[in-house]
């Protein structure tokens, strides 16, 4: 399975910093990924709403940082443009080890803005220091503020990190032992399960519908003709 965020240089840099004790005890994991990406009805419907199709990766990375299982959660979502399913969701809660989390994900971020942008970050807060990351899909910036070290690292974003996945898989074959850096099928199943659980929890609360289907039609039409945009589905001849 390719839980690709686990293979990214920025998340591994932050996790190594945490392991060094630079931020004290891990206390809070905050993850946000909002883009004007895949719109409802464009495809991927078999993968479910945005928070499952895309959001499960952020569910996984929060659990990966915490090193523990989800214990409690409360989710709020919005049915943007009066679409049948929520396309934005925020969930907060706790892990069994006491670490607190919040995850925000949605492809609703300025879909019809003249110049599109996004908001994607991870914010890791400890009892003594912090570590955080932002990216623009081209370059990632990691800022580390520990008790003895302060760093600001800028490197290429890295995309889906397929090269790292292949390298780890090849090493596992050559040694006959699965690399500990490779996720198990169980990890993917848990990420999927809890993405669905958070969606189900949101449906149990007030689920407002804001906007109109006509706006969604305009979004789809714009994305159909865009040459450069977020998460465009390429048509092959």
Residue ranges and their predicted role:
Residues 1-40:
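A contiguous active-site-proximal alpha/beta segment in oxidoreductase catalytic domains
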Residues 9, 53, 160, 183-186:
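Residue-level signal for the nucleotide or nucleotide-sugar donor/cofactor binding architecture
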Residues 194-205:
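Short arginine-rich
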